[in-house]
UniProtKB/Swiss-Prot annotation:
Expressed by the venom gland. It comes from Thalassophryne maculosa. This is Myotoxin TmC4-47.2. GO terms for cellular component: extracellular region. One of its GO terms (molecular function) is carbohydrate binding. Belongs to the true venom lectin family. Able to depolarize frog skeletal muscle fibers, but has no effects on squid giant axons. Tetrodotoxin is able to partially antagonize the depolarization. Induces myonecrosis. The lineage of its organism: Eukaryota, Metazoa, Chordata, Craniata, Vertebrata.
C-alpha cells in the first residue's frame, strides 16, 4: 500500500514491489 510499508531497499511501484540496490 504505502512505500513506508515496504522493506528497506524496496519501493512500491504501481501494484508491485521492486527491489532497488543502491550499491550495485
Amino acid at each position: 500500500k504505502a512505500s513506508s510499508s515496504a522493506p528497506k531497499g524496496w519501493t512500491h511501484h504501481g501494484s508491485r514491489f521492486t527491489f532497488h540496490r543502491g550499491s550495485m
